[in-house]
Amino acid sequence: MSDVSKASLPKAIFLMGPTASGKTALAIELRKVLPVELISVDSALIYQGMDVGTAKPNAEELHAAPHRLLDILDPAQAYSAADFRRDALAEMAEITAAGRIPLLVGGTMLYFKALLEGLSPLPSADPEVRAKIEQQAAEQGWSALHKQLEEVDPVAAARIHPNDPQRLSRALEVFFISGKTLTELTQTSGEALPYQVHQFAIAPASRELLHQRIEQRFHQMLASGFEAEVRALFARGDLHTDMPSIRCVGYRQIWSYIEGEISYDEMVYRGVCATRQLAKRQITWLRGWEGIHWLDSEKPEQSYNEVLQVVGAIAD
């Protein structure tokens, strides 16, 4: 697309960053002075009843800056990148039609990528094929299916852990339905985002600072009732660790503690480690991302002014 035709597109802002980097706080401040509406880009914040462990904005923050695509699903429900793209595009169109600018804020990079670049034409899920895969897994174990995936799609197998049944079964399902590998199909991009996007990423200048923030926040969450929140989910009886909601960082570790698999101290240690690993993956994604304006989360006023400088011009 030419620069001229790009300039005629409606405007949108991405505010990305690793967990515990201050994205939400910055977005809320920006909402006070810019004609923007916030859309959450977070695969954990979509779930109802998962507030403490996801660092969901509180009632006061949401009153000041309402977030769309927040609390839209029960934790028993699944939600794909395709679902997000569909919902985000609908919200963006509504915001743009009202004469305002969509500000998409979050840390789920796969959602941002799906929105920006479009999705490859993957086949829809087939319950019959999925049932056969699950039956085979019950008989032979998921490690045997992982070896099967290694034979047909070694690239996908290298990315998918043998203990990740959801992604493993999907990769095999795609191959059985289409005769093409997940790797082949994902190399075919879909429809690009019909917006002129200004992209920002916020993170601390040093990894040590981010690690400190993560550890402090995890302890704050525990002090704010994180364990009680997970116990309430556990008590429902219809949720389990194969579900994306319960695999969210922190939730999975507390779940293991509740089941008696690990001690409290081990749960805290694993929860902090898992959150740090998530942040590392998020930063790796962002470093390979083109067209990003980086912001230092340790300098909130400077970050705020930098965004205003760029966005102020497009918001006039």
From Swiss-Prot:
Residues 42-45, 166-170, 247-252, 280-287 are annotated as: Interaction with substrate tRNA. Transmembrane segments: none annotated. The record marks 108, 130 as: Interaction with substrate tRNA. InterPro entries: Dimethylallyltransferase, IPT, P-loop_NTPase. It catalyses: adenosine(37) in tRNA + dimethylallyl diphosphate = N(6)-dimethylallyladenosine(37) in tRNA + diphosphate. Keywords: ATP-binding, Magnesium, Nucleotide-binding, Transferase, tRNA processing. Its EC number is 2.5.1.75. One of its GO terms (molecular function) is tRNA dimethylallyltransferase activity. Substrate binds at residues 19-24. Its cofactor is Mg(2+). It holds the Pfam family IPPT. It is an enzyme of class 2 (transferase). GO terms for biological process: tRNA modification. Coiled coil: none annotated. ATP binds at residues 17-24. The keyword Transit peptide does not apply. Disulfide bonds: none annotated. Monomer. HAMAP family: IPP_trans. Catalyzes the transfer of a dimethylallyl group onto the adenine at position 37 in tRNAs that read codons beginning with uridine, leading to the formation of N6-(dimethylallyl)adenosine (i(6)A). Belongs to the IPP transferase family. This is tRNA dimethylallyltransferase.
